[in-house]
């Protein structure tokens, strides 16, 4: 029996990749609460300079990830997804270790760019599971996997803040590197993949990848949907704390209230993603996607009219429950419309669009709030999501008509 004939325990792989995504999500978000403080510690002074450098070191990771993702996706389709998971986890661990040793802002900026270049654990985990899980369970599996990164990202800022308070800023980078190395070890020992390497000559070129897709126009619309989902999420991030302060008035625990309101969508997504993924396996992920987008629009609009932080918290919880279905539904539709041979590249292209959304979303939110106020951000974001819902519905309708 050849290695490629050995049956894969995809359920165990799902469990281990979930742990890997949890650790990666936690590791990335561990350093986020004090990133501006570390920039200041590296010698940047002055309000405008601090804001500029903080924005640069935050966004450059996503920019370089967007550039590098297609390359790593192609390599994953040639060499296998497990080796890409190992490369990502070990590479990020080394970079995080070096970040804790940075002596000036330029070194730190270069390392943040390198982090983006070497990242990609979560999209490769998605590609691995998507190619191993039975098709009729794709929605549930990818929905479950998405909760790993979300739960890690929820826990990370809290743990990072506590660790920074007790041990200082630099040790948190060393702790984060250790977490990523644990992720590397888990992947090395417990994830199994039957993959026959493909020579460079046998690899499909970009045109052949597009030609092999069942519906290239639909796949492109799914990439755009991913971008807009991240734009909608990111547009609110820069103004959330300030908006909560405007609603709450003069209170002493504004940081706690803001942190809670920032985290409730993630908690809701944890609860909803596997359930809605399973529902999508029954009724179709395209229905879940369109309904979740429409619900998001209906929840974003009243956010601009709330009068108390608790009204905002309730609406954001409901929004998180709807949002928990969006990316898994997109990923499931990508699985349905591509082959295992090109899964690495398709998921990496999707990651590039996601990274672009991560950069443009906060910029859009900051620009709108500066010109028209905090409340306008929610209305404009609702308009963007409504456009996405109409665009996605039209793309899916064309696909259905083409099949008929």
Curated annotation (Swiss-Prot):
UniProt-listed InterPro entries: MFS, MFS_dom, MFS_MdtG_subfamily, MFS_sugar_transport-like, MFS_trans_sf, Mutidrug-R_MdtG, Tet-R_TetA/multi-R_MdtG-like
Organism superkingdom: Bacteria
Pfam families xref list: MFS_1, Sugar_tr
Bilayer-spanning residue ranges: 19-39, 56-76, 90-110, 113-133, 144-164, 171-191, 222-242, 254-274, 288-308, 317-337, 376-396
Keyword Cell inner membrane carried by entry: yes
GO molecular function, one term: transmembrane transporter activity
Recorded topology in the membrane: Multi-pass membrane protein
Keywords: Cell inner membrane, Cell membrane, Membrane, Transmembrane, Transmembrane helix, Transport
Cellular component terms per the entry's GO annotation: plasma membrane
Family the entry assigns: Belongs to the major facilitator superfamily. DHA1 family. MdtG (TC 2.A.1.2.20) subfamily.
Stored PANTHER family: MULTIDRUG RESISTANCE PROTEIN MDTG (PTHR43414:SF6)
UniProt name for this protein: Multidrug resistance protein MdtG
